[in-house]
Amino acid sequence: GWIALPAVLLLGARRGRYTKDGMISAHPPSNIPFLALGAWILTVGWFGFNVMSAQLIEAVSGLVAVNSLMAMVGGTLTALVLGRNDPGFIHNGPLAGLVAVCAGSDLMHPLGALATGAIAGALFVWMFMVTQNKWRIDDVLGVWPLHGLCGAWGGIAAGIFGAKALGGLGGVSLTAQLIGTLGGVTVAALGSLVVYGLLKRFVGLRLDPEAEFNGADLSIHKVSATAERETNW
């Protein structure tokens, strides 16, 4: 997420997304079923890499699995309510919770994981709208709010809900989590700025105007993302 932010800023908004008179042009998702399919493939697969990150069957922790599920539930519920049934928020809500719980899934009490996921779901919905509508940063997939901000919140949440006072297993420091999270954010953002800055300077990041108008799916892969646009109306 923090690698994506400089890339999105350097790339710039889609043509016509923000007009000179301050209006925002709507660009609805091209395929809601595929959006849902992709999000839930990630959600199901998340349990594979998060629970099996120990890489040994003997080391698998049931707590990690339960906490992953609880965070997913929290993220889904808050995204459903705050996103007002928007499918983009509904299907990304569970991912927001799962992103956030990764850092502390082996430490937190399940209720702490639920709270972590719920806050992440709310954070994603709120910051996606702020990013797009107020700051006019055209992060189409919401990668920065979903992975960057929810991931940073998860790093901090591990230091909060991992404490014994809140039902966690302890052995974690909020100060250390803050420092580690800030360090990770800094390295990712600065590294991305350098790499994408060089790419923009010497190669270029955008398609040509005609290819942008037709869309990357049609221009690069020769398949339109929206079949209804192939009609003659």
Model region roles, listed by residue range:
Residues G1-W233:
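Hydrophobic alpha-helical transmembrane bundles of multi-pass membrane proteins
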